[in-house]
Amino acid sequence: MNRELVWLFNFSSSWVGGGLIRTIETVRWFDNNMGAYFILNDRIKDKISKYNNNKYFFVSDNKMKRLFSDGYYIPKIIAEIGRPDVYFSYGIPVFNDIAIINWFHISNALTLKTDNISLPLKTRIQMLILKRRIIKSIKYT
């Protein structure tokens, strides 16, 4: 891995659909170029195993742990790799100043505006929690 510019990507909530495709394409590009660090969902371990120029940290999709302590794995990763130059978070709020540049990609705009949309109560609560976390995280990005 080239250490000139250190990238840390957090795709830990992307293990299906379009998020998975974006994850694999990003993994592939960085593997063919400078290499990067990736936080990934452990469900896709077999899909990226052939890309050896990157370093991976796998986390499980534990909804209860994410509800009460989202991003719990980040301090341990930073302790291992040091402060990255760029932290890119795909759909996961940035809870503190992780890198020199913190980049947050909102993958679901529904979380920001649920008024007048018919949603099950559980989904509405999830969206409200995520909305609050996104708003709190803006100051770090």
Predicted regions and their residues:
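Short, flexible loop segments at the rims of nucleotide/cofactor-binding pockets, characterized by
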Residues: 14-16, 63-68, 120-127
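Active-site proximal beta-strand in glycosyltransferases
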Residues: 86-88, 98-118
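Active-site donor-binding segments of glycosyltransferases and PAPS-dependent sulfotransferases
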Residues: 8, 23, 29, 33-93
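Membrane-proximal helix-turn-helix segments that form the acceptor-binding/catalytic region
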Residues: 76, 123-141
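Short catalytic/ligand-binding loop motif for oxyanion handling, primarily in non-cytosolic enzymes
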Residues: 16-18, 45-48, 94-98, 111-114
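Short, conserved loop/helix-junction motifs that constitute active-site signature segments
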Residues: 30-31, 95-99, 138-139
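A short, glycine/small-residue-rich beta-strand->loop->alpha-helix junction that serves as a flexible
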Residues: 9-24
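Extreme N-terminal starter segment of soluble prokaryotic enzymes
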Residues: 2-8
